[in-house]
Amino acid sequence: MAKKALVNKAARKPKFTVRGYTRCSKCGRPRAVFRKFGLCRICLREMAHAGELPGVQKSSW
């Protein structure tokens, strides 16, 4: 779990737009965040397996 201070800091609008960065909306992880879902790869995988993300299914080829 991310530090609460860093999550709050990322939520604020930065003075310069290039300073903004994405964080997972569920756990606060700063890396490997999918913009479309706002979730990190770990939370995305867990929620997809649980069926909590409509339209997401495991690929097979």
From Swiss-Prot:
Among its keywords, does the record have rRNA-binding? yes
**Could you give the cofactor binding note from the entry?**
Binds 1 zinc ion per subunit.
* One of the GO BP terms on file: translation
Q: Which UniProt keywords apply?
A: Metal-binding, Ribonucleoprotein, Ribosomal protein, RNA-binding, rRNA-binding, Zinc
Q: Which GO terms describe its molecular function?
A: rRNA binding; structural constituent of ribosome; zinc ion binding
What InterPro entries does its record include?
Answer: Ribosomal_uS14, Ribosomal_uS14_bact, Ribosomal_uS14_CS, Ribosomal_uS14_sf
Which of this chain's residues are annotated to bind Zn(2+)? 24, 27, 40, 43
Q: Which Pfam families match?
A: Ribosomal_S14
Q: Does the keyword Cell cycle apply?
A: no
Q: Which GO terms describe its cellular component?
A: cytoplasm; small ribosomal subunit
Reported cofactor(s): Zn(2+)
Among PROSITE patterns, the record links this protein to:
RIBOSOMAL_S14 (PS00527)
Say what the protein does. Binds 16S rRNA, required for the assembly of 30S particles and may also be responsible for determining the conformation of the 16S rRNA at the A site.
- Give the record's subunit note: Part of the 30S ribosomal subunit. Contacts proteins S3 and S10.
Name of the protein in its database record = Small ribosomal subunit protein uS14
